Amino acid sequence: MNMFSSLSLVTLLLLTMPIMMMSFNTYKPSNYPLYVKTAISYAFITSMIPTMMFIHSGQELIISNWHWLTIQTLKLSLSFKMDYFSMMFIPVALFVTWSIMEFSMWYMYSDPNINKFFKYLLLFLITMLILVTANNLFQLFIGWEGVGIMSFLLIGWWYGRADANTAALQAILYNRIGDIGFILAMAWFLTNLNTWDLQQIFMLNPSDSNMPLIGLALAATGKSAQFGLHPWLPSAMEGPTPVSALLHSSTMVVAGIFLLIRFYPLTENNKYIQSITLCLGAITTLFTAMCALTQNDIKKIIAFSTSSQLGLMMVTIGINQPYLAFLHICTHAFFKAMLFMCSGSIIHSLNDEQDIRKMGGLFKAMPFTTTALIVGSLALTGMPFLTGFYSKDLIIEAANTSYTNAWALLMTLIATSFTAIYSTRIIFFALLGQPRFPTLVNINENNPLLINSIKRLLIGSLFAGYIISNNIPPTTIPQMTMPYYLKTTALIVTILGFILALEISNMTKNLKYHYPSNAFKFSTLLGYFPTIMHRLAPYMNLSMSQKSASSLLDLIWLEAILPKTISLAQMKASTLVTNQKGLIKLYFLSFLITILISMILFNFHE
């Protein structure tokens, strides 16, 4: 076991080597990207040893050897939790990041700040691994905030563009809302249980834990772009493609789901939280799949598909299958990173063109990228015996056979068929048909950095699901029998999606549609969500501010109350004074007549 713990720590320490190397004489700035890529590849190979040992023995480990601080009765120590989730996730994250780093060496070649870019990516990976291996909430929070700030820096990498800055701010603001939930949960655990250690929280297992779990669900909603806090994920495509591949496919966005998986001992008997996560996940997966149907930006389609898959993971947590959700995280990382890298290869070759309507016929010019993109799309739809099938099919089978909300199940199935539609749409628009891009485009995909990185993920997309699912120890008693129609539901809805996509594609080719049609306005405008949230709220706020400034301050206080009131009082006085004509005889006579009449009346009454 000493070797197990040592190698686990060596894996984490290897990643800090490129940062420490900068203080040595042998450091050459021009080779820095190579240092980072090599360090990550070594870390991946090293991490496989403790992972194999763990699969063989099934022995969990907690490394806790540095006392950190004591607050009254709370003792915090720096501790790493090497359990099933962290031991399986570390090699997957390192393998995917290794490929993305190699891809970045090609994609960001001409960037003047490439060393800083690699530093940011490396720090991002380190904070993600801190989050995954953390054994207490405080350490987990450091990793949580780390991936948040690194995403902000990387999305806004091209800071000269207003869109990139807006997207980065949007990401950090939506994550802030989620962080409020995390901090509330931490505060609740501290005040009620006086501990932040995961073991102690699970051991005490408080019965009234709805409050912190809702906080954690809010945190997961912000970080994993669930419905309500989802708009930042498609906007984050403003960053460079390697950033999209790393942040929005395999690591950062699954942090929210990972948090809920970590807390599954508290959620497994809490039906209230399970219902919330199930319904939230089902709404997310359907809504974002609908939005993906009519997008034209290749990266935005893949971003919405990521959000849709995150909704599916949320559904899995809602039906009390955390291990299955984790399996989907691991399998999804391979083909989603590869899809982003293929789109990056196409964008780079077509002079930064992202609109799929301006592509077409790329299967001849870019055969390797085409192969990878088709395999990735099929893996995403859950094609049998590709990586996605091993988790996606199981999730839908589990949802079919569990006591679940029928509406949530129906929404998930519709979203699954939509997945097939938008995947087919990318293939038809970008790869098949006639070329619709300018003829003088210099297409070249013969760079070994590009080919090798995509090749590794392609192999992962073919075999990783089989390997990972066969190395998972069974956690609950499996369903022994199942009606064949429930077993084949996932496949049937996917095939339906493919048929529908072919039909729509045929109609589009033959110009049967009248553009713009109201039928897909909801999808094109992203469900009116940005219009309402990003336009209406600031408009109401600004108009209210304007009204209060102009009406309340100017018109009422500075005009009506002070100057106008004074002038009105003076006008009244001056009117009174000017009405005095100075006719003294007439005034005396009027007094006299009044006195005489009153005396006569007085005497008369006597």
From Swiss-Prot:
Q: PTM N-formylmethionine: list the residues.
A: 1
UniProt keywords (A-Z) are:
Electron transport, Formylation, Membrane, Mitochondrion, Mitochondrion inner membrane, NAD, Respiratory chain, Translocase, Transmembrane, Transmembrane helix, Transport, Ubiquinone
Record-level Gene Ontology MF annotations:
NADH dehydrogenase (ubiquinone) activity
Q: What reaction is this protein's catalytic activity?
A: a ubiquinone + NADH + 5 H(+)(in) = a ubiquinol + NAD(+) + 4 H(+)(out)
Its subcellular locations are: Mitochondrion inner membrane
Q: How does it sit in the membrane?
A: Multi-pass membrane protein
- List residues traversing the bilayer: 4-24, 43-63, 87-107, 117-137, 140-160, 171-191, 213-233, 241-261, 273-293, 310-330, 366-386, 413-433, 457-477, 482-502, 582-602
Sorted alphabetically, the Gene Ontology BP terms of this entry are: electron transport coupled proton transport; mitochondrial electron transport, NADH to ubiquinone; mitochondrial respiratory chain complex I assembly
What is the enzyme's class at the highest EC level?
translocase
**EC no.?**
7.1.1.2
The UniProt entry's GO CC annotations, sorted and at most eight, read: mitochondrial inner membrane; respiratory chain complex I
Query: Superkingdom of this entry's organism?
Result: Eukaryota
Subunit record text: Core subunit of respiratory chain NADH dehydrogenase (Complex I) which is composed of 45 different subunits.
Q: What family classification does the UniProt entry report for this protein?
A: Belongs to the complex I subunit 5 family.
Q: What is this protein for, i.e. what is its function? A: Core subunit of the mitochondrial membrane respiratory chain NADH dehydrogenase (Complex I) which catalyzes electron transfer from NADH through the respiratory chain, using ubiquinone as an electron acceptor. Essential for the catalytic activity and assembly of complex I.
- What name does the UniProt record give this protein? NADH-ubiquinone oxidoreductase chain 5
Q: Which organism is it from?
A: Bos taurus
